[in-house]
């Protein structure tokens, strides 16, 4: 059984609160979905805004390998000739191979929203579908609010489908627009629908009851051959069916022909691309494509996974382009530590006392407030230290930081930093002294310190110019202590090729930030040296 995937991220997904895709964003997403193997891409509603019109103009010259672009619109307006309906005429100008039309299935909407008669609504559906069949290879009919309409007035809801089928619709998509229908209802209603229409059926599920993916799978079980959804489940209110779950479930769990199986490995990257372009943080525990979808923390779990991953993983993470993560925390056992050390490329025997020493140190540090989830660079530096493999690239000699606020001016911070590097590093670069004492300003004390220490070290390690602080999180650990509370700072950094996290803990937020900053730069230098060594060996 072959299932067609219809992506509506660029229209329904863009209706999510706070999401607005630029034209360039839309084109990047379209290219990524085509590469993934998606069959249809709904580009937007040409009659609703200039940005969607620009998108359809832009894609006219693009040659997609897999997907067909669809333009979306409503049926003609009540009591208006189809040739005179502005929305329909704008839709035709999009010149897409597929037109998707939504019409009313629920008598409540016909009478209250459209404010027309039930008979006129049927004419609107027929006129629009039959007219558009003259201009496109394919017309998809979206039956808006179909399941609610069916429950309210079964006979009328079915009539709307029959009319669309008679007009020539290539697929009838049943929409759970309010997201209130449950899987068993989906199955029962589709069973009945199949007795009255012969056209292929599709499903468009919203997630207001948290069952959009389940409803989509239920529809397929009962014969739907067309599934609609969005990447990461983006959409209005609670979102749409998440294609990042729907697709692998159909392929890996139900054994259906959807996209090429080898293309599933691209799913993780597509999910993260859409998250980045939408400006919405990626949900870390999202099934299949979340960063922590295959993360293991408990020592017993890790021990079992080492023997056979099937013990705690429902699929191989690599099938969807993801990876297994072994977390380090106070819950970690020997298995976690061993696995992480091996991931870093260090050889260590299982019986080595160093393993238990590292585990003991982790538990001591976590008791002080350290947390190594999300700070794997700090964990690696700790391991290097305890294995005698931590190189000293620089020595911190001191810093001063102050915040200045004048009466009529914005406040700013100034930091001075003094560092020392090994003599041989200074000599190799032609510097007379291995010291650097410098200052920098920033909007706040942490930014000032960050700029100052980079300025000092870039003189000796030019590659640090590529490093940027990309995220900064602060957590107060013992709030009852008030202003004396211990602070944990988590910093995320990137050099354009890698991302890594470091952590610092102190009652002084500046000191905690300083620790995390220094470890971030030290980790970068370790990785640069490793990369250089690997290049020389190859």
Swiss-Prot record:
User: What pathway is it annotated to?
Assistant: Amino-acid biosynthesis; L-isoleucine biosynthesis; 2-oxobutanoate from pyruvate: step 1/3
Which top-rank group of organisms is this from?
A: Bacteria
InterPro entries in the record: 2-isopropylmalate_synth_dimer (IPR013709), AIPM/Hcit_synth_CS (IPR002034), Aldolase_TIM (IPR013785), Citramal_synthase (IPR005675), LeuA/HCS_post-cat (IPR054691), LeuA_allosteric_dom_sf (IPR036230), PYR_CT (IPR000891)
Q: Which UniProt keywords apply?
A: Amino-acid biosynthesis, Branched-chain amino acid biosynthesis, Isoleucine biosynthesis, Transferase
Keyword RNA-binding, does the record have it?
no
Q: Which Gene3D superfamilies match?
A: 1.10.238.260, 3.30.160.270, Aldolase class I (3.20.20.70)
Q: What catalytic activity does the UniProt entry give for this protein?
A: pyruvate + acetyl-CoA + H2O = (3R)-citramalate + CoA + H(+)
SMART domains attached to this UniProt entry: LeuA_dimer
EC annotation from Swiss-Prot or TrEMBL: 2.3.3.21
How would you classify this enzyme at the top EC level?
transferase
Read off the Pfam families from this record. Answer: HCS_D2 (PF22617), HMGL-like (PF00682), LeuA_dimer (PF08502)
Q: Which residues form the Pyruvate carboxyltransferase domain?
A: 3-268
* GO MF term list: (R)-citramalate synthase activity; 2-isopropylmalate synthase activity
UniProt-listed GO biological process terms = isoleucine biosynthetic process; L-leucine biosynthetic process
Free-text function comment from the UniProt entry: Catalyzes the condensation of pyruvate and acetyl-coenzyme A to form (R)-citramalate.
Q: Family assignment?
A: Belongs to the alpha-IPM synthase/homocitrate synthase family.
Q: What is this protein called?
A: (R)-citramalate synthase
